[in-house]
Amino acid sequence: MIIDTHIHLDDSRYNDDIDEVLNRAREGGVKRFIIPGAHPDTLERALEIVEANSDVYFAVGIHPYDMDGFDTLDFDMYVKHKKCVAIGECGLDYYRLEGTDEEKEAEKLRQKEVFIAQIELAKKHNKPLIVHIRDASRDSKKVILDNNAGEVGGVLHCYNADEELLSLANENFYFGIGGVLTFKNAKKLVNVLPKIPQDKLLIETDGPYLTPMP
């Protein structure tokens, strides 16, 4: 069975042609779709989509770029929905840190706090995690291990080819692979891929982002 484990169907760019997008994917053999959570503002749209399509599911979470919504989001209400299958996407992203060194460290600390809170939520509700990692492999791995995230496991969304993360396969984590694999600068990922157990690989598009190169 082909499952697109990460597609942002709640993105406004799909508003006008979502039925066409889903039908093309179905015709291509995709049987299930998972909408990751990223920001509270898109959750209601995600609910509309999953309730209208029996083969679409969703996750609830706060992306590290959208932490302002963390304190106001009623996680429990969404997690209890029958089609909520995961927590995330959540994690650490240091790629766009700005400001002084002190401000950057404060931002890292806040990201860790929000990530840990979502790990605890996942354990509370026995849901797997959708983990976002960018330029933060070492800290992300430490947070995952220190907080026993392997109890619920999950997927490392858009796996970044960092070999430091490979051992998380032993902690109940899978590796999400998508369009990045076709990019000209993906040689490292191509070389690392054979080191991942085949039963730990998941397919994702991350649509409408990361379109494969022709």
Model-derived features: positions:
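Mid-domain alpha/beta scaffold segments of enzyme catalytic cores
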Residues: 1-214
